[in-house]
Amino acid sequence: AQDAITAVINSADVQGKYLDTAALEKLKAYFSTGELRVRAATTISANAAAIVKEAVAKSLLYSDITRPGGNMYTTRRYAACIRDLDYYLRYATYAMLAGDPSILDERVLNGLKETYNSLGVPVGATVQAIQAIKEVTASLVGAKAGKEMGIYLDYISSGLS
């Protein structure tokens, strides 16, 4: 996993070439959204707990999953769910800043689906909560930054599905 800049430079370096027009355009696009990504990350970092709390309220709180017999019924399981969702939000933010979703493969998704299945964690409910995080985040950071952040949250959802 590497950031967008390193990926472009390494590609040219492996070929022993200077950056071509296409590579420079990729860098230009990355830098042109830099301020937007940093502003979004600042807002997300300052509001992470509230984002996760609101996303859980929107997607999971009043469903069967939190009632007796449900997978999130017990404080310990509920806390584990909150912890996982916070982790996904944090790593999606890192990936957004880097401009590269492959960070998520290595740090989040490798073996996660298998682990969830072996522990009986409902993947569908998790994906639903991640989509709620996407919605809450977009309402907080604005449409353009929300769309950018959504790329990385969708990447996690797809990796779990």
Curated annotation (Swiss-Prot):
Keywords: Antenna complex, Bile pigment, Chromophore, Electron transport, Membrane, Methylation, Photosynthesis, Phycobilisome, Thylakoid, Transport. One of its GO terms (biological process) is photosynthesis. It is found in: Cellular thylakoid membrane. Its main location: membrane. GO terms for cellular component: phycobilisome; plasma membrane-derived thylakoid membrane. It is a peripheral membrane protein. SUPFAM superfamilies: Globin-like. It comes from the Bacteria. The modification N4-methylasparagine is found at N71. Contains one covalently linked phycocyanobilin chromophore. (2R,3E)-phycocyanobilin binds at C81. Pfam families: Phycobilisome. Light-harvesting photosynthetic bile pigment-protein from the phycobiliprotein complex. Allophycocyanin has a maximum absorption at approximately 650 nanometers. PANTHER family: ALLOPHYCOCYANIN BETA CHAIN, PHYCOBILISOME 32.1 KDA LINKER POLYPEPTIDE, PHYCOCYANIN-ASSOCIATED, ROD 2-RELATED. Heterodimer of an alpha and a beta chain. Belongs to the phycobiliprotein family. This is Allophycocyanin beta chain.
